[in-house]
Amino acid sequence: MSINLDKFSNIIKNQIKEYQNKALYSEIGRVINVGDGIVQASGLSNVMLNELVLFENGSYGMTLNLEATTCGIVMLGKFEDIKEGSIVKRTKNVVDVPVGDGLLGRVIDAMGNPIDGNGEIKYDKKMPIEKIAPGVMARASVCEPLETGTLAIDSMFPIGKGQRELIIGDKQTGKTTIAIDAIINQKGKNVKCIYVFIGQKNSTIVQFINTLKQFGALEYTTIVASSASDLPSLNYLAPFTGITIAEEWMSKGEDVLIIYDDLSKHAIAYRTLSLLLRRPPGREAYPGDIFYLHSRLLERSGKINKENGGGSITALPIIETEAGDISAYIPTNVISITDGQLFMLTNLFNSGQRPAIDAGLSVSRVGSSAQINAVKKTSGSLKLELAQYRELDAFSQFGSDLDKETKEVLEHGKKVMKLIKQDKNTPFSQSLEAILLFSIKEKYIRWIPVDYIEDFKEKIIRHFKQQKTILETIDQTKDISQDLFVQIKNEFNSLITSYIKTIPDYNLDFVGL
């Protein structure tokens, strides 16, 4: 076989012409030290803060510390087989998560990966989890109510769309129940919900998912779950994943409710990472930027103007206190960042009051401007009355010799507490709340003995649900006109008259209708 040397020569010449002397460039470093989910690496001289880095075992990490010759990396996956000398590569990307409607009804981890066994998530784009909050001129004032369905909250501490209302209290005081009821009550109200679990038990997360399924609320809810068994780095990232998903909907003009359960564990996770990275500790061993951690997270919630999308993110962060100490470091930080707080009392909860909200310490700083007129007119001085009752009730423990006026205030307070008592997973509509508040405002409950108040409340609910026109009118107009006021009054007069006849040994002459 003859060899065509000219042909070979031409092939070689063409290859030389097309050859480009380009080296495959990749920044790599070496692991110096590894332990407790923290890696110290050298050689990554151009790495960014919060950049994702890839280890040779396929796990990712995130840079949190940048020093002269080394960088501190927190692991986001398995690190057991990473050892000194292992290779680590830059990705030149920050942590980003999928966003969009494909996340509704799904349970994801802090990295945006599905963990509910329902297959891959369909999404159009990913967004970085760190973003600067909207500026002052991009925001709009809070003017629409976010209906929680909890009578005590909607009447005394109303929450507006775009507000940040803290739920604070000890363990087992009903904090999560308020958040769940708020989500259940958004059904049919075109509000998307996000629930962020931070360092919670897996059994608690499963129970929560089952509750949402039971009430058909999972279809408009996204759950970001970072359990107690996850790495501190994932507990740290979870709230930022949640708010990033919410921001995408807000930018499209939609309303979002996001709940962080809870930020106490978030602060502990960040403290753990900071101490392992050898950052200098401050008060209660928290790092110096712990306030900034929560402020930059919560400032991303709010209501934005039409030019920027016109949507809103309402945030309900939860803080767990120890022995009712709201003056501790993290509680005072978050109280100063948020637009109000609902303080849950242990002794109220143990006495059977649900929700166990302290009317004296709780406040909503911007929600009243978003309250509908029907509830605003009927709630009146309810908060003041309850605060007076709590004060007098504590004072009355010291002596039995009370004047008539004090006894009347205490009696009225007991009745109001019974009336605003509400079982979990039974949210009220705003029209029904206005009717129940009407019975307090117009002093109809004074004719009913304390022991019969809860039964009378059920009678009110049944009676007005049958008289649909009154509730429908309030729902449509969001107000109580003079004609409607008279109509409601007549209904109550007939209801009271018929109800007191069913009470044994009741003195009918006592009623002044």
UniProtKB/Swiss-Prot annotation:
It comes from Malacoplasma penetrans (strain HF-2) (Mycoplasma penetrans). It is a peripheral membrane protein. It is found in: Cell membrane. Its main location: membrane. Its EC number is 7.1.2.2. It comes from the Bacteria. The keyword Kinase does not apply. ATP binds at residues 169-176. Produces ATP from ADP in the presence of a proton gradient across the membrane. The alpha chain is a regulatory subunit. GO terms for cellular component: plasma membrane; proton-transporting ATP synthase complex. GO terms for molecular function: ADP binding; ATP binding; proton-transporting ATP synthase activity, rotational mechanism. Keywords: ATP synthesis, ATP-binding, Cell membrane, CF(1), Hydrogen ion transport, Ion transport, Membrane, Nucleotide-binding, Translocase, Transport. Belongs to the ATPase alpha/beta chains family. This is ATP synthase subunit alpha. F-type ATPases have 2 components, CF(1) - the catalytic core - and CF(0) - the membrane proton channel. CF(1) has five subunits: alpha(3), beta(3), gamma(1), delta(1), epsilon(1). CF(0) has three main subunits: a(1), b(2) and c(9-12). The alpha and beta chains form an alternating ring which encloses part of the gamma chain. CF(1) is attached to CF(0) by a central stalk formed by the gamma and epsilon chains, while a peripheral stalk is formed by the delta and b chains.
